């Protein structure tokens, strides 16, 4: 019963588990997350859950059929870290931020002008660790692997709190 993403209009800040696709605007991302949330709360939930696992499709298209469309949404919001050429998903990558010669790039380095000045906060990338860039903040500091939990004060983007024990 949790949203796939949260958008704070007053702060122009979007919070998502893994990321948003570079071919989507902020409004489209919100709309796709809402579509998925409605399905998960409705009578199609069981069918969506039965069809949600898999690494395909890897390329976004408005023509994706319903289960491929939902799987793509789920993979972007919850699993995506890097993209290959033509903004295709690479869901197997688990390393640190790739170097320029690896033929992959972090999803947030797509130079998407559709995101304007929205700050996007995400996790799901403990190998990347805490990362603060002007528009992007990765808060995954590896708590699930026994490292610290990191939190951020949204009123002051650079005021961090690390909690070493839960």
Segments (PLM) and residue ranges:
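Feature recognizes metal-dependent phosphohydrolase scaffolds
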Residues: 1-166
